[in-house]
Each structure stands twice: as structure tokens, then as C-alpha cells.
Amino acid sequence: KFNKNLSNQLNFDEKIFWTKVKNFDSKGYFVTTFDSSEPTLKFANKPYIINAKFFDHLPYHPYTIDEVKIIIENIYGINFKEPPMKYWPEIRDDWISSIFESRSNEEWLELSQKYNLSGIIVPSNWEIKINEKVISEKYILYKLQ
């Protein structure tokens, strides 16, 4: 007997949102948050630049440290050597929301060009200075390409 996997359940609004994200013609990575990393990959089949929920792989794959440092500092705006919370392998929304919201459209487009970013998926109450977007009750996709 199989049990129903509740983690695969989406309400109607979220199902529409993730279908739109999935159908978004993109070739780059997506910047995600603590809560949007997993569904970006799971429901939209889109690659994230880093899993903001956890990146505890560094001790096992030290050759990735330089790239992770660049992503965390340049895209997420967090000091790699002095993070808000030491020994915490995640990026919390409250650490980055004001950084993301304070960037101009031009700054986001520069990051998009430099790091091959197609979009940003954040909680729906964040206001990022990008016009083209897809909105749901829970998330917003800001399109960069």
C-alpha cells in the first residue's frame, strides 16, 4: 500500500504558478530563497544557482568553495567569512530580503548577464524592482531574460 505524499500536493493557484515557471523559456539559473529552492527544482524543473535551504556539501566538496563564495557574496549579498549566523548552512530570507529589494533593475540585469540568471523566485510579499513577473499567492517569479 502506498501512502499519499503530501509534499507533492499543490493548491490550484500554486499549480498554475509552477506550470508558468516551468513553461518560461529560460536558459539560465534561478535565484531562489529558503522556501523557493525546492519547488523550483521539483515542480518547475528549473536549475537554481544555489540551494538556499542548505549547502552543507562544502566540507565534502571543498573544490566548490570559491564558486559558492562568489554566489553568496555577489548575488545574495552575504559576507562569506562573516555570515549573519556562523555554522548555519542556509540562506535565511530575513538576511537577504532588504538586499534584494534595494537593488535596481539595472543591477539585477548586470547580475543576470554576469552569472547567467533567468529569474528570481521569492516570497510574494517581496518587492523587487523588476517589471516582468508571474505572481501567485505564495511566490513571485521576476523574469530577468
In which residue ranges do the predicted regions lie?
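Short glycine/proline- and acidic residue-enriched helix-loop micro-motifs
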Residues: N3, E90-D94
